Amino acid sequence: MLYLSEENKSVSTPCPPDKIIFDAERGEYICSETGEVLEDKIIDQGPEWRAFTPEEKEKRSRVGGPLNNTIHDRGLSTLIDWKDKDAMGRTLDPKRRLEALRWRKWQIRARIQSSIDRNLAQAMNELERIGNLLNLPKSVKDEAALIYRKAVEKGLVRGRSIESVVAAAIYAACRRMKLARTLDEIAQYTKANRKEVARCYRLLLRELDVSVPVSDPKDYVTRIANLLGLSGAVMKTAAEIIDKAKGSGLTAGKDPAGLAAAAIYIASLLHDERRTQKEIAQVAGVTEVTVRNRYKELTQELKISIPTQ
């Protein structure tokens, strides 16, 4: 098969560069005008297999998957399968099965030897568990894993519970990736209490110099509205209310989730898609008192008139 090659530009020849072609089967550079073989015995550095799509290329590649920060050893080690079958797919006899069990035990011990390995293995399992419960995307879990690894390298986990530091790393990752999750939402899935997670979060920001953007109440609007089954019109109105509140300086020092919840409550009343303060507060992860206070502030300061039933 003949095709143009970028590498042919390095071949010193009077043949015009755009006339040089490469014969992959013969390993030769040829001038298409004169038929002269410019260079031969070229070693093909590419794979011996063919792939026509990126998916086929990835499937046929033998170099393994990319590094995975959510695995304690980043996925670099090998695993002995638990299927108890040989290379031909045949079930192992009882004697071989016991041998495979012993190999697995020793292989696991070899993978997790140091105290740091054991710490990371436990932490990454906890991170995966919380991430799945919160339905977090892989990018956020990867970011949380990186933050936790930095904390381990700096010795910040020593003397603190792994669960609280993992939860704090997840919250920091959500903030960095602008994913609307409150500290209460994350803390409810850990053995640590909210106060401990918040303390670890502040520690990570201070010691690791992790920069997080200021939370925007509008980031919470879509998620809360979707969970409540509200329309796009309600979301749009809630976002407009938040923009007006920002312009009036009402958002400074306020919990963004509480502001978003109050804005959605007002918008749902304006569009006659009524939800109770209790329903909205539960979904937003705030108290009814917070929703009620923010509701009063927004309606009074922005002079929003709520229609009566």
Curated annotation (Swiss-Prot):
Q: Which InterPro entries match?
A: Cyclin-like_dom, Cyclin-like_sf, TFIIB, TFIIB_arc, TFIIB_CS, TFIIB_cyclin, Znf_TFIIB
Per UniProt, the keywords (alphabetical) are: Repeat, Transcription, Transcription regulation
GO BP field: DNA-templated transcription initiation; transcription preinitiation complex assembly
Q: Which CDD domains match?
A: CYCLIN_TFIIB_archaea_like_rpt1, CYCLIN_TFIIB_archaea_like_rpt2
Give the highest taxon in the source lineage: Archaea
**Pfam families registered for this protein in UniProt:** TFIIB (PF00382), Zn_Ribbon_TF (PF08271)
The sequence repeats are found at 125-208, 219-300
Q: Which GO terms describe its cellular component?
A: transcription preinitiation complex
Molecular function terms from GO: DNA-binding transcription factor activity; TBP-class protein binding
Q: What does this protein do?
A: Stabilizes TBP binding to an archaeal box-A promoter. Also responsible for recruiting RNA polymerase II to the pre-initiation complex (DNA-TBP-TFIIB).
Q: Which NCBIfam families match?
A: PRK00423.1
The family this protein is said to belong to:
Belongs to the TFIIB family.
Recorded hits in HAMAP family, A to Z, give:
TF2B_arch (MF_00383)
Spell out the protein name for this chain. Answer: Transcription initiation factor IIB 1
What is the primary gene name for this protein? tfbA
